[in-house]
Amino acid sequence: MKKVLIANRGEIARRVIRTLKKMNIESVAIYSDADAEAPHVYEADYAFHVGESPSSASYLRQDRILELCKNEKIDAVHPGYGFLSENAGFANKLKEIGVKLIGPSASSMDVMGDKLKAKQAVKAFDVPLVPGVDEAISDIEEAKAIAKEIKYPILIKASAGGGGKGMRLVNAEEEFEEQMQMAQNEARSSFGNDAVFIEKFVEKPRHIEIQVFADQFGDVVHLFERECSIQRRHQKVIEEAPSIVLSPEIRAKMGEAAISVCKACKYEGAGTVEFLMDAELNFYFLEMNTRLQVEHPVTEEITGLDLVEWQIRIARGEKLPKSQDELKINGH
């Protein structure tokens, strides 16, 4: 791997360039009209204009990025986060032209990008799930019966959802019909998919995510947790590592569950498995983010590791740099 294109901008592009320089790999930046003078453009070894200022006319233009990969003999693409980082179609197109995506396969993205598919995949690996259903529901009466069985309060959630969109809390049966219709409408307009499912609402939950890495040989490790319970409108505000509520035993159990999630979708690269935890410290699988996250430096601080370097090493076919026993938490 001699030449890597970063299909992103700003802070994450600069972060990837820093590690590429350290590893003596050539970096290729892309930029829009608005970013012509941006730091990542000057810090990369090469930089190419891909379009006008709106991201839809530049950073999301798969055709231009793929053409650039072919013309500039790019070996691999680092997608960063956002933009095309969890786009299975883009992953497939890169594969077709012989360019390695520094990330998971399209099939892993496809499974984990749909909450229902993800639940069905991890169920076979005995990963704890919030009580509810793991199939799409459209019939109101059937949905009401399920809600009654698992007891209110319940959540109606969009299968393709994220960031709190297409999610509705229902406290009583008389609210159900209206809230379900609102969830479906929001899911349809936000994701083009109105499939919804029902889960028991976990009251006063903690939100704990586990950083994972998997190589091409089927080996998986976890790099411990980040707690992101402090949120506003379902968006994380503070990330803390390690979590103050996890005992070594619970941490190990959550880590094993996260590893099972990776195995359920034949994962490769960096990912984050998110769990909800109730007041009794029971934890439940929520979803998996199939990319490096904005908050990855929090994990780097407590492990002393360069997670972008791990991503690149795995993408070029190396084994995991460390075993689970060699990984330790250092600091807070």
Where do the language-model regions lie?
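Polar, glycine-rich mid-to-C-terminal structural blocks
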Residues: 305-312
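Active-site-proximal structural scaffolding
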Residues: 301-304, 329
